[in-house]
Amino acid sequence: MRALEGPGLSLLCLVLALPALLPVPAVRGVAETPTYPWRDAETGERLVCAQCPPGTFVQRPCRRDSPTTCGPCPPRHYTQFWNYLERCRYCNVLCGEREEEARACHATHNRACRCRTGFFAHAGFCLEHASCPPGAGVIAPGTPSQNTQCQPCPPGTFSASSSSSEQCQPHRNCTALGLALNVPGSSSHDTLCTSCTGFPLSTRVPGAEECERAVIDFVAFQDISIKRLQRLLQALEAPEGWGPTPRAGRAALQLKLRRRLTELLGAQDGALLVRLLQALRVARMPGLERSVRERFLPVH
């Protein structure tokens, strides 16, 4: 019998090799499903069983003649990964008082929570978004994961109140409005304009209300020290002397002074300026008294 040579030998080798090559795709396909070792309690046989996909659990392990049986997770339970658990995990995440549900409990994942609107997550707690103080504006609103981002108002802009949402606003342009500049704008208040050019010292005339409002703004928003603001407030409250004033910031004192002057405007018929000039003398503020006279009292 002649031995095969050349092309005949190559063809025979290929035919013999085919049975060994065919199972490879099947083995590769099985390997894509995770497995786990299992010992059959009845036969003592050691088996390799397929795991169950997310959202299910092992209802019955595989046997020599049957694959793994997987069952769906019951309500309020889940499995997130391929597994060989005998029961699904309970959805044990509960949202706190300052949290809301970001993702509901599902067969494939636990419940997820996030901080409610107005709060952000920090070190495991939901903290309230900070407010930017007067003189600073919001550059990035707070999110569930980040606090409010503030920055000082740049020149030409202002923010008059504490806010977690307001940006710095541009100062108004008095000239463009056809008005006179009363008080220059700062980082914490707008430019104050007026149409007032001066009014009699003690007589109320038509249109005097605009001048009275201008006087109030002019005095209340002067760039003076907190100590002097306190002295003037106390002089307006008690002309004969004053007691201690609770500690407060400049912006709060300016607003309080503005409210007090507005109260005096309503209570004293045409005598606001007289009363204010007296208080400035009592508070030992000759410079501001002189500025008020030069700005609002006509020269005779």
Swiss-Prot record:
Keywords: Apoptosis, Disulfide bond, Glycoprotein, Receptor, Repeat, Secreted, Signal. It comes from Homo sapiens (Human). InterPro entries: TNFR/NGFR_Cys_rich_reg, TNFRSF6B_N, TNFRSF_decoy_receptor. One of its GO terms (biological process) is negative regulation of apoptotic process. The keyword Repeat applies. Glycans are attached at N173. It comes from the Eukaryota. It holds the Pfam family TNFR_c6. GO terms for molecular function: signaling receptor activity. The gene is TNFRSF6B. Decoy receptor that can neutralize the cytotoxic ligands TNFS14/LIGHT, TNFSF15 and TNFSF6/FASL. Protects against apoptosis. PROSITE patterns: TNFR_NGFR_1 (PS00652), TNFR_NGFR_2 (PS50050). This is Tumor necrosis factor receptor superfamily member 6B. Detected in fetal lung, brain and liver. Detected in adult stomach, spinal cord, lymph node, trachea, spleen, colon and lung. Highly expressed in several primary tumors from colon, stomach, rectum, esophagus and in SW480 colon carcinoma cells. PANTHER family: TUMOR NECROSIS FACTOR RECEPTOR SUPERFAMILY MEMBER, TUMOR NECROSIS FACTOR RECEPTOR SUPERFAMILY MEMBER 6B. TNFR-Cys repeats lie at residues 31-70, 72-113, 115-150, 152-193.
